[in-house]
Regions:
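Non-catalytic, low-complexity flexible loops and terminal extensions
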Residues: 1, 97-179, 373-388
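Acyl-thioester-dependent acyl-group transfer interface
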Residues: 1-49, 56-81, 200-388
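Generic anion/oxyanion-binding catalytic loop in active/binding sites
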Residues: 15, 95, 165, 179-180, ...
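Acyl activation and transfer enzymes in specialized metabolism, enriched
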Residues: 19-35, 92-108, 168-204, 353-355, ...
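Short, charge-rich amphipathic segments
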Residues: 37-45, 119-134, 174-190, 294-310
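Histidine-centered acyl-transfer/condensation active-site motif
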Residues: 69-120, 124-136, 345-362, 372
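Amphipathic alpha-helical scaffolding segments
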Residues: 108-111, 197, 210-213
């Protein structure tokens, strides 16, 4: 569906190793895994009435520097870039190529190959299995009621736009789990609830519209889906800014759990894909389809004050042996349909929350730190990384 979008969402994995990265060895690692990870070595082919992915046989180059080359203009039409500087490796990619869980196996594979070359390890580097795409038409037949207007509509809200400022929050994972256990809720619920407290104070709003993403691979029976396989929800919450977590944790947990039920997830996917299918079926030039899609996305979209995406352990499969070579891991994604975007990963017992903030007002890091500390969660860092 992202082919039709005017503005593509770019994601970043930022991996800090203990030692300086050797660009030549990183290039060798990328070349070695190429035959094992065909999905990622593709390009978009633009036809008169449609666009599709096709294999790309051009050279795929590792570059040096923190700044990503323009994708796909400066990457030989590849939809990702791999670059490094100092001790850090950067992966940048278009979200329509893969979501976070879809990209993690490739990132893990490249790191395994690099460590084998750099440190003489013997990590297995095996071909990544690929599940075929699901049929959205069958999904729509299963849930025809999902296409009724206003099925999941919230009151529209205004969101901030512009270049975001970056904020980083680091939390002790064990203390968050303890806070969740005290309330009898999921750790993600505790995380979301406390973020609602901090964001409510920062935005000075008594009612928030929060958003979160849910992975459908297990629900759809597609564990090896490399493509984008998530849904998003936008849900309201009142009174979090002036309340303790205990006052609303159970209700928040019930709402999140309800929306994570398999049937609800499939229904939501049908909702999201319905308009995409209708646009695809139009017998019109691609540029017209893009305009129709953008108009429909604007009219039917439900922007949120903020969204939270929890990746957890970033490596797939999980590998404590590989993690030993990694000092830090950060995930950055531009806010899409929200004023704030938070990506959370877990490594070495630390939750790292990378926040992109379009509000352009100082104080968010401090507001979140106060909210987490008040609920007994140990805050290891709360930093505004860009000048306000």
């Amino acid at each position: 569906m992202y082919y039709y979008r005017a503005n593509q969402v770019i994601c970043r994995y930022q991996i800090a190793l203990h030692d300086p990265v050797d660009p030549a060895l990183l290039q060798r690692a990328l070349d070695e895994v190429r035959p094992l990870a065909g999905w990622y070595f593709q390009k978009v082919v633009w036809e008169k009435r449609e666009a599709h992915l096709a294999p790309n046989d051009a050279p795929c180059r590792v570059t040096v520097g923190e700044a990503a080359p323009a994708i796909p203009e400066a990457t030989n039409d590849y939809l990702f870039s791999l670059h490094c500087e100092g001790t850090t490796i950067y992966f940048d990619w278009f979200h329509f190529l893969a979501d976070g869980r879809g990209f993690s196996p490739f990132m893990t594979l490249v790191l395994r190959a690099y460590c084998n070359l750099r440190y003489g390890t013997a990590f297995a580097c095996e071909t990544l299995a690929e599940d075929p795409p699901y049929d959205p038409e069958l999904l729509l037949k299963e849930f025809p009621e999902s296409q009724k207007a206003g099925a999941e509509q919230n009151q529209p809200i205004d969101i901030f736009e512009g270049k975001p400022d970056r904020i980083r929050l680091r939390l002790d994972r064990a203390s968050l789990i303890e806070a969740a256990a005290r309330e009898g809720v999921k750790p993600f619920t505790a995380l979301m609830g406390i973020v609602c407290q901090g964001c409510g104070q920062y935005l000075e709003k008594g009612e928030l519209l929060y958003s979160f993403a849910a992975d459908l691979r297990e629900t759809m029976g597609l564990p090896n889906a490399r493509y984008n396989c998530i849904v998003t929800y936008q849900l309201p919450l009142k009174g979090a800014a002036g309340a303790r977590l205990s006052a609303f944790a159970k209700a928040l947990d019930a709402a999140i759990r309800e929306h994570l039920k398999p049937e609800r997830l499939r229904y939501r996917l049908a909702e999201q894909m319905g308009f995409v299918c209708r646009v695809f079926q139009q017998k019109a030039p691609l540029k017209i389809k893009q305009r129709i899609f953008q108009m429909g996305e604007y009219l039917s979209g439900s922007p949120a004050d903020f969204w939270v995406s929890y990746l957890g352990d970033p490596f797939a499969p999980r590998s404590p042996e590989l993690e030993a070579y990694v000092e830090d891991f950060q995930t950055w994604v531009l806010p899409d349909g929200a004023s704030l975007a938070m990506e959370v990963t877990s490594l070495h017992g630390v939750l790292t929350a990378c926040i992109e903030n379009k509000v352009h007002r100082p104080g968010l890091a401090q507001a979140l730190a106060r909210a987490f500390a008040a609920e007994g969660v140990t805050v290891l860092e709360a930093a505004e990384l860009d000048e306000q």
